[in-house]
Regions:
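Hydrophobic alpha-helical connector segments
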Residues: 59, 73-100, 149-153, 176
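C-terminal peripheral helix-coil segments that are non-catalytic and often amphipathic
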Residues: 1, 86, 93-97, 125-137, ...
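Key DNA-contact positions within bacterial/archaeal DNA-binding proteins
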Residues: 44
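Amphipathic alpha-helical segments used for helix-helix packing
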Residues: 94-115
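Basic, helix-initiating cap at the start of DNA-binding domains
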Residues: 1-25, 29-41, 54-55
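Amphipathic alpha-helical packing segments from all-alpha helical-bundle domains
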Residues: 66-69, 114-140, 147-151, 177
């Protein structure tokens, strides 16, 4: 009797293998065959799930964006600034837990990635801007803070990410507290 394959699990295994190879070799230098070898399957098996490298990259980031959405969904209750602090910690934790995804993101940033990177940024900016508006409404923010500061907060997180990726002496996870402190206390009334 032929071995039954859990298609969803196999798909995730292939995506995980693709992210590892993309992070190690770069997206442009990666071939489908490289992903197959990393996943321990035949090249043709990859094509049963994904028709191209772009589809692999898109699938990997769809999975990552789902996890990112969970961070936003799990902010809980409390003041808007408490939730902003949890958002910073959660986002940095996610990036620290998935450094290969972060490496691939940096690799494809300047290129024209096959997924909607702008949509991911809009979602995060919108979530942060909502928290800033709520904090402003509750009298928690000093004057002059507005939705533009959402992009600055994202920039602070990404700046730390870049440093952690290029310098092994920098621990991204250890920067969560300082980033949250600067981003939240720097805008608090």
């Amino acid at each position: 009797m032929p071995k039954r394959v859990d298609r969803a699990a196999r798909r995730e295994e292939i995506l995980d293998a693709a992210v590892r190879v993309f992070a190690r070799k770069g997206f442009a230098a990666t071939r489908i065959e490289d992903v197959a070898v990393e996943a321990g399957i035949a090249k043709g098996s990859v094509y049963l799930y994904f028709d191209s490298r772009d589809a692999l990259l898109t699938g990997a980031f769809d999975s990552y964006i789902t996890r990112s959405g969970q961070v936003l969904a799990e902010l809980g209750t409390g003041t808007a600034l408490d939730r902003l602090t949890r958002l910073v910690h959660g986002t940095i934790g996610l990036l620290a837990d998935h450094p290969d995804h972060a490496r691939v993101l940096l690799d494809v940033w300047a290129a024209n990635p096959p997924f909607d990177l702008a949509a991911m940024y809009r979602e995060y900016r919108s979530a942060i801007a909502d928290l800033l508006r709520q904090a402003q409404s509750d009298g928690e923010l000093r004057s002059g803070i507005d939705e533009r500061h959402a992009a600055v907060i994202i920039g602070a997180i990404e700046g730390c990410l870049v440093q952690a990726l290029v310098d092994p002496q920098v621990s991204l996870r250890d920067l969560a507290g300082p980033v949250a402190q600067v981003c939240v206390e720097g805008i608090r009334r």
